[in-house]
Every structure is written in C-alpha cells, then in structure tokens.
C-alpha cells in the first residue's frame, strides 16, 4: 500500500473512533456520521495532488468531533426535565476568561471548575 493510502486509512480510523466517542449512546447519529465519513472517503478515493490536504482535513474533523462536540439528552416522558450534557474526558474545557480576551496573550492559572 502507498503512503497516502496508509495515511488515509489512519485518518478514517481516527474519524470512526471520534464518532464513537462523540455520539456514544446515540446510535442514529453515530451511524449517520459514519455513513457520511464513508461517503466522503469514497468520493475522494483517487490519489491526487490534494490528497495530503484531504487527509489533514479528515484528521482535523476527527479532532473536532472528539474534543468539541457535546450532546444533550433530555429524559423521556418528562417535558419539564432539564437537558443533561454528555461531557466525556476528551472534551476541551475552557472558561469565560479565555473567551473574553480572545486573541490576546493571556495565561490563566486557575482550574476551570474554580
């Protein structure tokens, strides 16, 4: 197998792992995400000049899925119930201080939960 094919396979596996983490316990969305990933990889399976860019894009998508996607769950049957977020260990956590000062060099020395 060629190097781009091996990298593409690795990127595809990263996306599958990321979808498993991001959409745990949501079979419908998990299957739809994996189907879309498969469709995109099948659509671009010919090796070309832009292959490294496409592989890099797939790796970035996997990272976003793994670190930035949080799903909300509302208990069934209770309309007054509040939504609960499924936050897992890989989720990137920030705080309001980092958002308020975006683009500036800032060092935050406190924990997010403090």
UniProtKB/Swiss-Prot annotation:
Query: What's a GO biological-process term for it?
Result: mitochondrial respiratory chain complex III assembly
Is Repeat given among the entry's keywords? no
Q: Where is the transit peptide?
A: 1-18
Kindly state which keywords UniProt assigns to this record, in alphabetical order. Answer: Chaperone, Mitochondrion, Transit peptide
Any GO molecular function: protein folding chaperone
- GO cellular component assignments: mitochondrial matrix
Q: Does this UniProt record's set of keywords contain Transferase? A: no
Where in or outside the cell is it found?
Mitochondrion matrix
Do you know which InterPro entries this protein is assigned to? Answer: Complex1_LYR_LYRM7, MZM1/LYRM7
Q: What is its quaternary makeup? A: Interacts with RIP1.
Physiological role: Assembly factor required for Rieske Fe-S protein RIP1 incorporation into the cytochrome b-c1 (CIII) complex. Functions as a chaperone, binding to this subunit within the mitochondrial matrix and stabilizing it prior to its translocation and insertion into the late CIII dimeric intermediate within the mitochondrial inner membrane. Modulates the mitochondrial matrix zinc pool.
Q: Which PANTHER family match?
A: COMPLEX III ASSEMBLY FACTOR LYRM7 (PTHR46749:SF1)
Q: Which family does it belong to?
A: Belongs to the complex I LYR family. MZM1 subfamily.
Q: What is this protein called?
A: Mitochondrial zinc maintenance protein 1, mitochondrial
Q: Which organism is it from?
A: Aspergillus oryzae (strain ATCC 42149 / RIB 40)
